[in-house]
Amino acid sequence: MENKYDVVVVGGGPAGIASAIASARHGARTLLLERNGFLGGTATLAMVPALCGYSDYNGHVVTGIPLELLENMVKLGAAIDNRGREYPFSTYSYVDMETLKYVTETMVLEAGAQICFNALVVGVLKTDNRVTGIEVETGHGRQRIEADVVIDCTGNGDVAALAGAEYAFGREEDGRVMGSSMMIRIGGVTKKLTDPDKDGPEITALLQPAMANNEIIHYDRVFAEPLPRKGEAYINTTTLFGSPIDTQVASDWLWIGRRHAHCLVQALNKYVPGFENAYITQTGCQIGVRESRRVLGDYVLTEKDVKSAARFSDGVAWGALQAIDIHRAMPDEKPIFDKFYSGAYHIPYRCLLPKGLDGILVAGRCLSADRPAFASARMMVNCMSMGQAAGTAAAMAVSQKKQPRQLDACELIDTLRADDVNL
């Protein structure tokens, strides 16, 4: 790992993967830093294999690197490609998580980017209001790395926060965030799972005796969804409450989540036909976090924008999920799933530019949005689209010797379109 790069991408999840690929393909010397030992972020670390946001109510929308990734997975027989189905099924495609690690790192390396695993960013280099690099901790010590542009794809907005960016956190009245989840991969399933909206309520009803007997905690709904390998499914049900940026809370979630997972699978064995011989093959090594910091940018995407299928002159990515999906922040609350059918909406480039800071972009879950808009835009395919835009912008800024904020948005959009991004 060298001491100077054109572009440093922090975080190897969906947004970071796309950022690094796009930046490197456009000629920037690009370093991708990931604090764990593989790429994929929420999709692999937290085991959320449902890549959501490929299409809106009117049909296929998202192309570019997100589509390229899915097609690479399909070629290897490692994805359930739902694009041919009707909405909402068409917006989800399920992937094999182990294969996803291999495919994503192959795409990043073939693009020409460098990956450094097990690298934790602990500080930011700044001159006045300009981010000039990062400080990273590895098993070999601490290193300062300069960069013309840093892209924060950490999900939690960690780098932007270290740089002093303004951000919103949780809901306005009390700062609480949506519950996080321990995902569970299981094998030995003989029940055919095809429709979460039908399968979930059926399984939940069968588990009522287990809830009544306190064999498991109360669940409003048990989501069991298929995986590409025969007999495998993943369960997205356990909910853990608190702040994901509280170190002890986030640590406790791991053992609490594993305890919930084992109790739940035992109940499935006992009460649900088709799950009699189901067993845990893996639980997430990271909790699936839905909400934390939203870095305030030059524009804040709004609920009205999302629901009205807004178009912007600097729209560089699509939000395709036709719903505002707000999970419970407390156990006694009800989730909100507010559907709308107006069509996909633009995510403006200004939402990726932290207000008052130069030398830095954000992409993914930490975008600039109000809470309802964020609850739609946070999906992983949307995050990849933002990542491709941010990586492309960073490389253009380097080649033009400009700050990201100084780029011509129309030129950026033309470049994305030339890269098969449907805008």
Segments predicted by a language model, with ranges:
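Beta1/beta-strand and adjacent pyrophosphate-binding region of the FAD-binding site
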Residues: 2-13
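Conserved N-terminal/central alpha/beta ligand/cofactor-binding core
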Residues: 22, 28-29, 34-127, 178, ...
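N-terminal Rossmann-fold NAD(P) dinucleotide-binding loop
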Residues: 16
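Short, hydrophobic/aromatic-rich segments at coil-to-beta transitions
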Residues: 128-134
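Membrane-embedded transmembrane-helix bundle of lipid-linked glycan/lipid transferases
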Residues: 8-10, 19, 24, 129
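Flavin (FAD/FMN)-binding glycine-rich loop and adjacent Rossmann-like elements that form
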Residues: 42, 137-138, 142-149, 153-423
